[in-house]
A protein has these predicted regions:
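N-terminal metal-binding scaffold of metallo-dependent hydrolase/deaminase domains
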Residues: 1-41, 51-52
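C-terminal helical cap
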Residues: 8-10, 106-113, 283-285, 326-342, ...
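Active-site gating loops and adjacent loop-to-helix segments of metal-dependent hydrolytic enzymes
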Residues: 68-102, 131, 146, 159-160, ...
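Alpha-helical scaffold segments that flank or form the walls of functional sites
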Residues: 72-124, 129-147, 171-180, 488-490
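Metal-coordinating catalytic core of metallo-dependent amide/deamination hydrolases
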Residues: 128-259
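Short acidic/histidine-rich active-site segments
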Residues: 217-224, 286-288, 296-317, 422-428
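C-terminal cap of metal-dependent C-N hydrolases
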Residues: 427-484
Length: 503
């Protein structure tokens, strides 16, 4: 039995296109679109009441393991900079995760996303106390709600050689599982934390793993100035140059944030290619600055970085902060962590207490392996390079909506299905809203309606793979109230374990 959606304002996002019409869905795919479509015997016919119908949204960078962090107690010491936010909050949370919390966080995170019209999650997971099989737990939690996922495990040197090896193996194991399944519902990338917690030999191993599975690397890039500063201080290289030298900069990769890249770094990303995940609400929350997204010519998508699953809110934030920055009101980003601090603290950040530091040389490892050494830092880039990027171009509403659609383009590559399109042959991941515009809605002004008319509160029903996962605001795939009650109990236990983790 298929479905026919009639009397709908069909809204494609990239490029913006609005048509009044109907869709027919069968076997998980859109099979017909037009002013009217013929139903077949047994089809369910749904009158959308003249409301907006959109493709399902894709969260380009998230951490569903943070779902149970909402309302958690403050850390014992107030963070004073980005590194302390990681050390005192998120690295304590991820170490406190057990199997129950991992699966439940994924399920709750997926439920929150579903209610916001998000149908696919590109997730970056970390649980150093429970690594083996962790991605199976995340996948189960997401699948129980009916969403699609592109998953990875965060490889890092923070927990010493054993933790690093376990992270790489979890990525390999899950990549093998996904390559065997190829069902369009789940896929994988190679996960990496960030340059400043990864030694050279690990970058080589990650690139080799990506080569083995013909995929990309999902990594945080220049979220805070400390990432670039650490790279220049320890390796005499610019951050993007280091990632490129070891093969992590590639068209299949996802570079999250890119908040502090200068003009030459942006040009290199544009030239070689990667998909940049822009997370404006997280960047504001962590006070790390504003990414020069207007300068990117490579694909850009929106992510929430674990702040829920509401991409409508993320799009609006992206527009507002771009306006703020265009007016020059953002000001310089202050950080108490300067390059010189890294030599003083050694591997204190890269390796948490009890973990061994590898202390590899930036060039010797590749030379010993018969490869050429990465090019060292040879010149200092102008301090105004990034500033000119921020001020030179203003984003338009159409560009913001293009970023909103960007996650679907990237997820389509990994999953092997067409997402983000209301057209024949595309996956039937569809959001039915109750938004009946009270002003004219056209292809030209659709971005304005998305930014200032639509919101997640207007999401009424959601199809994923042609199945109703949310119908008239009722979750169909699981007992939502029971899951929320379970989550409240599990969150208390998680928070107690966090309190026992040393900062």
């Amino acid at each position: 039995m298929g479905q026919v959606l009639t009397n709908a304002l069909l809204c494609d996002l990239d490029p913006p296109r609005v048509e009044t019409g109907a869709l027919r869905i069968d076997a998980g795919r859109i099979v017909g679109r037009g002013p009217t479509v013929a139903s077949q015997p047994g089809d369910e016919v749904v009158d959308c009441g003249g409301a907006v119908v959109l493709p399902g949204l894709v969260n380009g960078h998230t951490h569903v393991y943070s779902a149970l962090a909402v309302g958690m107690p403050p850390p014992p010491k107030a963070p004073q900079n980005f590194l302390e936010i990681l050390k005192f909050v998120w690295w304590r949370l991820d170490r406190a995760l057990d199997a129950e919390a991992i699966e439940l966080s994924a399920r709750i995170g997926a439920l929150e996303a579903l209610r916001c019209g998000t149908t696919t999650l590109i997730d970056h997971h970390a649980s150093p106390s429970c690594i083996k099989g962790a991605l199976d737990l995340v996948q189960k939690g997401i699948a129980d709600v009916g969403l699609r996922g592109v998953l990875c495990y965060e490889t890092t040197d923070r927990h010493g050689p054993d933790g690093r090896a376990a992270g790489i193996e979890e990525n390999r194991r899950f990549l093998e599982r996904c390559s065997n399944a190829r069902d369009g519902r789940i896929s994988a990338l190679v996960g990496a934390h960030a340059s400043f917690t990864l030694e050279d030999e690990v970058l080589e191993q990650l690139a080799t793993l990506a080569d083995d599975f013909d995929t990309g690397v999902h990594i945080h890039v220049a979220e805070d100035p400390c990432d670039e500063e650490d790279c220049q201080h320890r390796y005499q290289m610019f951050l993007v140059d280091r990632l490129a030298a070891y093969g992590l900069l590639r068209p299949e990769s996802v570079f999250a944030h890119c908040t502090h890249l200068d003009g030459l770094a942006v040009a290199k990303v544009n030239q070689i290619g990667a998909t940049v995940a822009h997370n404006p609400r997280s960047n504001m929350n962590n006070a790390v600055g504003y990414a020069p997204v207007a300068a990117f010519r490579c694909p850009v998508m929106l992510g929430t970085d674990g702040i829920g699953g509401d991409l409508f809110a993320e799009a609006k934030a992206a527009w507002l902060i771009s306006r703020h920055e265009q007016a020059g009101l953002g000001g310089p980003v202050e950080t108490s962590t300067r390059a010189a601090d890294f030599s003083a603290r050694g591997d204190a950040v890269r390796s948490e207490p009890g973990a061994a530091a590898t202390g590899l040389d930036a060039r010797a490892g590749r030379e010993a392996a018969g490869g050429s050494a990465p090019s060292p830092l040879t010149s200092v880039r102008g301090s105004d390079a990034r500033g000119s990027l921020v001020a030179s171009d203003a984003l338009t509403p159409t560009q913001i909506v293009g970023m909103l659609a960007g996650g679907a383009r990237r997820a389509s590559q990994s999953l092997g299905v067409t997402l983000g399109k209301l057209e024949a042959g595309a996956a039937a991941d569809i959001v039915v809203t109750d938004y009946v515009p009270f002003t004219p809605l056209t292809s030209e002004n659709l971005p304005g309606h998305i930014l200032f008319g639509l919101s997640s509160n207007r999401v009424r029903s959601v199809l994923v793979d042609g199945q109703w996962r949310l119908r008239d605001r009722i979750v169909r795939a699981c007992d939502e109230q029971a899951e929320r009650a379970h989550a409240r109990e599990a969150a208390q236990r998680l928070w107690q374990r966090m309190a026992e983790v040393p900062a």
